[in-house]
UniProtKB/Swiss-Prot annotation:
Principal place of residence: plastid
Compartments, record wording: Plastid, Chloroplast
Keywords from the UniProt entry: Calvin cycle, Carbon dioxide fixation, Chloroplast, Photorespiration, Photosynthesis, Plastid, Transit peptide
MF-aspect GO terms: ribulose-bisphosphate carboxylase activity
Protein name, entry field: Ribulose bisphosphate carboxylase small subunit, chloroplastic
Role this protein plays: RuBisCO catalyzes two reactions: the carboxylation of D-ribulose 1,5-bisphosphate, the primary event in carbon dioxide fixation, as well as the oxidative fragmentation of the pentose substrate. Both reactions occur simultaneously and in competition at the same active site. Although the small subunit is not catalytic it is essential for maximal activity.
Example GO biological process: reductive pentose-phosphate cycle
Other facts: The basic functional RuBisCO is composed of a large chain homodimer in a 'head-to-tail' conformation. In form I RuBisCO this homodimer is arranged in a barrel-like tetramer with the small subunits forming a tetrameric 'cap' on each end of the 'barrel'.
Family: Belongs to the RuBisCO small chain family.
Subunit structure: Heterohexadecamer of 8 large and 8 small subunits.
Disulphide bond pairs: none
Natural source organism: Nicotiana plumbaginifolia (Leadwort-leaved tobacco)
FT transit peptide: 1-56
GO CC term (a single one): chloroplast
C-alpha cells in the first residue's frame, strides 16, 4: 500500500513538470507565437497620431486682472435664456435649487492657508432656504432678481443640491456686480 502511494506521487510530479512545459493551443484567438517576443520601443511621439500638420494652439486664460469664479467662469455672462436653460437642467436632474451670495469676494481666494484647496474662498451666505419642491425655473430667476435688489454689489450663484446623495452637483454664477 505504501509503495503505491509513493509511486503515484512520483508520477504526479513528473506529469506536472511535463504540463508546465506544454503550451495549449488557443481556440478562437491568435496564438502568441505569431507576435514578436521583444519589440523595439518607439519613443518618438510624432509616430503616435497625426492631424496632418494642422496644429492650432488655444490661448490660455490670462491670469492678470481676471478672476476665477466657478467652473467655466471664463465664458461670457449667461443671458436670461441661458440661465433658464441651466435652471431647467438642474430641475430635470432632480436637484434642489439654492441661491447663495457673497458681498466681499465672489472669487476663489486663500484666506487661512497658502496651499491650494477646493474650498478656499467658497463659503457663501445662503439666500433664504433651499427651494425644496420647486418645479418652475422662473421662480428661481425671481429669487435671483430679489437677491440682486437686496445686494446690488454682491455675487449671486445658483447651486443644485442632490438631497439623496447629500452633495452639491452644479454651481454657476447668476449675477456679478458691475465691473467684474
Amino acid at each position: 500500500m505504501a509503495s503505491s502511494v509513493l509511486s503515484s506521487a512520483a508520477v504526479a510530479t513528473r506529469s506536472n513538470v511535463a504540463q508546465a512545459n506544454m503550451v495549449a493551443p488557443f481556440t478562437g484567438l491568435k496564438s502568441a507565437a505569431s507576435f514578436p517576443v521583444s519589440r523595439k520601443q518607439n519613443l518618438d511621439i510624432t509616430s503616435i497620431a497625426s492631424n496632418g500638420g494642422r496644429v492650432q494652439c488655444m490661448q490660455v486664460w490670462p491670469p492678470i486682472n481676471k478672476k476665477k469664479y466657478e467652473t467655466l467662469s471664463y465664458l461670457p455672462d449667461l443671458s436670461q435664456e441661458q440661465l433658464l436653460s441651466e435652471i431647467e437642467y438642474l430641475l430635470k436632474s432632480g436637484w434642489v435649487p439654492c441661491l447663495e451670495f457673497e458681498t466681499e469676494r465672489g472669487f476663489v481666494y486663500r484666506e487661512h492657508h497658502h496651499s491650494p484647496g477646493y474650498y478656499d474662498g467658497r463659503y457663501w451666505t445662503m439666500w433664504k432656504l433651499p427651494m425644496f419642491g420647486c418645479t418652475d425655473a422662473t421662480q428661481v430667476l425671481a429669487e435671483v432678481e430679489e437677491a440682486k435688489k437686496a445686494y446690488p454689489q454682491a455675487w449671486v450663484r445658483i447651486i443644485g443640491f442632490d438631497n439623496v446623495r447629500q452633495v452639491q452637483c452644479i454651481s454657476f454664477i447668476a449675477y456679478k456686480p458691475e465691473g467684474y
